[in-house]
């Protein structure tokens, strides 16, 4: 009996040591895994950041992956032009050439088959080129803040010949500029500076935000994306709420949430290139009536940054790390993410008591 008990005790001790080794290994693994949560409203550039991580840290897009984006890019180009043509009537803008009215009818007749096949036929290409070139359509495009139009519209519509070619293969820039609404939760893993990063992107639409809570566990850092150029735009969801006001409200709720007391908070003030272009035409006061500064990129960008940072109610203990970004610019994102990683590592070491 005593011998059998001794054997059982030895086995229990071996089992205990195996568990201890596993726990130590798991603890070390967790310390080397960084969970990044991408948050922000719709159209803030979160999914583009994920694509950039694939380009910078995961080998990019091979030929087959590039080809897979062709139907989406075709859809983006067609959808942009149909939105412009539909907006003509609402904005009471006429075609410069009356013949374009027939082209508009043809556009809507031909787009269904084109989108289902993922290709632009020569007939549809001619229709799209004539419509896009019409001064009336261009005037409507110039008033795109009065209806919903994606940022990539001009990029694709100015290059229809290339996109419509039968042998068209999307470039990396084409892919970065493509727009597909994120639904659900998208995870992307990569290694950088001997750390494993798990970047989690969740949809920014109001209907998607109820899913965010499922991603909060074990978050090392939050990257909150802001659409700088959205200061004059309304939400898709209700066409009334200011996109910037919605972003500020959302940031307030994340920044001051007790769940994230020990979580690094990084603010990506994104689409700086579009803000620089837009601020020359549309004053910042349309969103912030109290703004008295110059309508220059430098002053407007800093003012918007301050609006977000001032929402932090725990300035003594929580720091916000802000960066101005252009999500479609790989070199910019590479530089910023390198700096962000250093901050995350430092804060993580501090949190676990090693710094």
UniProtKB/Swiss-Prot annotation:
Lipid linkage positions (N-myristoyl glycine): 2
Residue ranges, annotated region (G3 motif) = 197-206
Q: Where is this region: G5 motif?
A: 325-330
List GO terms (cellular component aspect): cell body; dendrite; heterotrimeric G-protein complex; membrane; plasma membrane; synapse
User: Could you tell me which residues belong to the region G2 motif?
Assistant: 174-182
For Mg(2+), which residues are the binding ones? Answer: 47, 182
Q: How does it sit in the membrane?
A: Lipid-anchor
Matches recorded under Pfam families: G-alpha
Q: What is this protein called?
A: Guanine nucleotide-binding protein G(z) subunit alpha
